[in-house]
């Protein structure tokens, strides 16, 4: 255990080469928090006895009750490496004390926005995978997010105790299952990795994969075993590491290494990994679990494990846990893997800077981030807000990328919409205190240099969820985070007692601060809407709202799904609309945008802020757009970045540029509330064909053009075979074979369609993947558990928007029923207005 003081930590923060910022990511219930415990215990914060049960990182009451992690929490660990290990580190280091900032993030898919916030401030990730279940859908999602942020992964294969005790596998089977898991992780890595990172695949023989059990507190890497044997046999450690994985065999008779499975007499040889690594572990397990009292002391002596007085009386699992913890302590293996293989901020920021910074790659701040320079101007990214014990106040949680942040320092607080040189979304305020985040506690410090993760007090009123802090007036923002999930499930919230309304409004503000991916807004009907990524996410948000943020009893409507409005074909005739004073006319047509273009816009590949020519080239080369059209995109909508476009196809129109702003504003308005039932439009492209304008500027102001453009857009939209789109989840369900039938029956009832079904090799488990409309997903988990006797566990991720085939304008069709219900709820007329209402005759 380390005697651990804040001053020690503060001095470590200055040697940035010895800092590691890393997050722990994994599928739900693969054991992140449990593994994190053994690390925290090593750094001397939990007492040794409680580790494995403390789940120190789950700071919230509901996390401990549900046994899942909801928010990502940060903690700093201190580790000293032996000199021989420090020699092997590929990057520069000073001395052998290391500071590891670790963020434990949730695995449940509804909270993947928390994961994004955690990834942004770290440089490396520990990916935890369950031996038995292997790589699941969420493992892939978070790993893809990490690689997208240029983060280097290392892998820990967890729950090996399950394979040994529950499934009783043989050594060769265990090796094969390890090797399959490593392979499937590497497939994901090679698919999504950025070339700049170089080869970031994981190799057990290079020590980037650990195997172990978080619950029992043991883990090992091949490097550790290679070190043991290298001393014993006097061989080179690196050679030994390569031999302990893959197809290499040791022939005990001839004392020679070979890569053939059989010896000269055709006898089967044992794989080196099984013989040297798994054998001692298997023998310990067998001796202890079969209560062979006489074998145990012999084995312990061979492996140099000393038990203290009362530990000798233990037996069964308790003894197993004690022995394995002493033989292969999890913290040592993981800390060694983290320190040896993950990059320091100095290394990482060199290749992450361009991706983090919005401005040009050659300006002073970008260069400072590349160097991770503590003496430059401050560049600090706040990735999320953490509620304090004090009701309604938040710590800003983030990372210093350049410069040094001090208590009492005056900084420019730039929100996500800030543009250099303008005054919008900008505050200049002083930071009250700088604190170290330590899981459940915070420790105040004076200042914090570049490359470290930090909490700030006193700026929570000025930032909504994330933003950039800087001392340089010309600095651009750090790039906004891309969330892999979108809020598609909404509820309306009202107070039971009308006097509590102000508290609700205040509570909603705090809620949207504390969760990076929740949307709160007030609908036109005066309802307060809360939107979340799924059922569980919403449930947690509303519980927070009622108990913490607002603190008043609430009435909550049944959940509603967000739809989108779209078109199928080009408008059947040109839509024309005249301005209220009859002096201006706009002619346009609407047509659909290809799905891949919409997806490229939504994922940020085609970006409204990109350079015009570069964007046009991408659209022409990859998506087959006409170059002149691609250059004449006026705007994206809604909110200036949605998947709808206005394209100017006019020829030689006078005064056209003067009305551009009005047209853009009208388009934002029209796409935010479509004509069918006031939902956002998606994949609609409006081509402006011709405009006739009045010669006097006074007769073509915003008041004339905006309503005209909106009416024209609606008319063109309704003339182009309108359809509605519903959100669809990708569901992954793991279950034993006997339960597969139950899954199919529930999915059929819920309009689900099965995409694939496969058995995981070496286990009795099946994985079923299916598409399930979000609309049908409420209560799905409960019904599934009933139908399968609680053996099936679904994971749902928003996957895509699916167009409903039926006609939304026909009130008897499926789509029509949805539209009518929504229009009633919004308080509109029940019948959708025809295109004639928005169309003007010449």
Curated annotation (Swiss-Prot):
GTP binds at residues 26-33, 158-161, 213-215. The keyword Nuclease does not apply. GO terms for molecular function: GTP binding; GTPase activity; ribosome binding; translation elongation factor activity. Residues 17-253 form the tr-type G domain. Keywords: Cytoplasm, Elongation factor, GTP-binding, Hydrolase, Nucleotide-binding, Protein biosynthesis. It is found in: Cytoplasm. Its main location: cytoplasm. InterPro entries: EFG_II, EFG_III/V, EFG_V-like, EFTu-like_2, G_TR_CS, P-loop_NTPase, Ribosomal_Su5_D2-typ_SF, Ribsml_uS5_D2-typ_fold_subgr. GO terms for cellular component: cytosol; ribonucleoprotein complex. Its EC number is 3.6.5.-. It catalyses: GTP + H2O = GDP + phosphate + H(+). It comes from the Eukaryota. Catalyzes the GTP-dependent ribosomal translocation step during translation elongation. During this step, the ribosome changes from the pre-translocational (PRE) to the post-translocational (POST) state as the newly formed A-site-bound peptidyl-tRNA and P-site-bound deacylated tRNA move to the P and E sites, respectively. Catalyzes the coordinated movement of the two tRNA molecules, the mRNA and conformational changes in the ribosome. Belongs to the TRAFAC class translation factor GTPase superfamily. Classic translation factor GTPase family. EF-G/EF-2 subfamily. This is Elongation factor 2. It comes from Naumovozyma castellii. The gene is EFT1.
